[in-house]
From Swiss-Prot:
One of its GO terms (cellular component) is cytosol. This is RNA-binding protein Hfq. The keyword RNA-binding applies. The gene is hfq. Pfam families: Hfq.
Length: 86
């Protein structure tokens, strides 16, 4: 059996990416960046905005991420646990 650490950050961003949910990212300097999450890793979030403009945002500069609609992490977490128990 494999033990995995629950990482809400990754669940949230991955769900927003897969479901193509628009997000507004508020940076610590007050700037807002709006768009779709195209990818992320431990250090950055790649956002595609209007007119396919790409923004690479360092996570240490992020204050808040607000999704355009509710992201249900409960079902995602249950699915991951079910897959890990097989």
């Amino acid at each position: 059996m494999k033990n995995t650490v629950l990482n809400l950050q990754d669940l949230f961003l991955n769900n927003a990416r897969k479901e193509r949910i628009p997000v507004t990212i508020y940076l610590v300097n007050g700037v807002q960046v709006k768009g779709l999450v195209k990818g992320f890793d431990s250090y950055i979030i790649l956002i595609e905005g209007d007119n396919r403009q790409q923004n690479m945002i360092y996570k240490h500069a992020v204050s808040t991420i607000q999704p355009g609609k509710y992201i249900n992490l409960t079902n995602q977490n249950q699915n991951n646990n079910n897959n890990n128990n097989r």
